[in-house]
Amino acid sequence: EGTYVAASESGHHSRPDLNAIQHAMSWWDRVEAIFEPDEWVPVFEQVTTKPVDIEGGVSVDGLSMESTMEFQLRVPPERTPDEVRELSDAELEIGTVNWTESIPPVMTNPRTELARVFRAAIRAGGGDPRLLRKTGTSDMNVFATEWNCEMVSYGPGDSSLDHTPNEHLPLNAFDNAIDVLIDVCERCGVDDAATSADGETTPDTEAAQ
């Protein structure tokens, strides 16, 4: 993630010079051109670009035109955040980019013992496990750099509904996901994985799509 910031001298809108807002748009066009989507390459293996907020206009003192644009660049495992930042910064003509701390891409081996246990538990619950290369970030992106252990990102529901107005999870799918997680813990030898002191089932799960 990053924030592009630029300023230009204020003047009549009929002037041919580019103002700060136009500089922001021009820079973003060049960044998108660098990482132009390739229909022959899976989305997971490409850098994806997305502006998420833009503001601009005459400054409070009226002496300059200002623009601020927040954006996100998703980095595939084959590239590094530093490489993507360097390429984006190279396209700057006016303005600066303030980068936030990057979240590194992660891709795990689907043939680990933990992945096998998850597939078995899903099938035991009547489900059909599918291996996906998730394009969005999850907690695993952070934990993978700190924990030296096998990891799996699992969630029930229709992932195409993520972050949409119709995002939802049927209650039966939620209940089944809890059963899957309990089964996984039992297969991994975790005792009382989802049982509190009074015997009530209290799973700590996130109903993620």
Question: Across the structure, where does each feature detected by a protein language model lie?
Answer:
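Metal-dependent amide/peptide-bond hydrolase catalytic core
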Residues: 1-209
